[in-house]
């Protein structure tokens, strides 16, 4: 079994920023109205609001912090410097990719209490003095012959969305 993640879970609201009306995005470049739309879309599904929040990468954070009014004032910067975005906490993870060719990234909004993470047994480790393995360059190593200790660590985890209506996944957001 391979967890699919929020973005690939059937039923999760998927929003293509490049296909939005100009009020919200212009060819993937978000306007100040877009985050309000995403939050309203999720909240309209009667989602529990106790653990709502945002997740995006550092390019997205920088983009949002730099959105200005027509008079040059930053719209979100002060709030984001305090760790919130539209009144909800956000976290930055650079595991959320930005495509270097298109300059597009992704963002998530939802009730994170509805993202279930299961551990089957914690971390299981094994060590050996006589194991053999092949490294990333194709070179075979033998622990006994090279006076090494081989360690293997296993962790069985699973992740799943409990209520699909609790999340929105936005992709094709132009940030660079």
Indicate where each model-derived feature is located:
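Alpha-helical scaffold segments that mediate packing/assembly in large oligomeric complexes
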Residues: 1-41, 176
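Short, catalytically relevant binding-site loops at active-site mouths
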Residues: 6-9, 59-62, 97-98
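Short glycine/threonine-rich loop-to-helix capping motif typified by GTGT followed
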Residues: 18-23, 64-71
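Generic recognition of stable, solvent-exposed alpha-helical segments in well-folded globular domains
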Residues: 30-33, 55, 59, 146, ...
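Long, positively charged binding patches that form subdomain-scale interaction surfaces
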Residues: 34-40, 59-63, 68, 83
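Extended amphipathic alpha-helical segments with heptad-repeat/coiled-coil character used for oligomerization
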Residues: 46-48, 52-53
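Generic detector of multi-pass transmembrane helix bundles and their immediately adjacent loops
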Residues: 54-63, 90
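Sequence/fold signature of self-assembling virion shell proteins
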Residues: 70-176
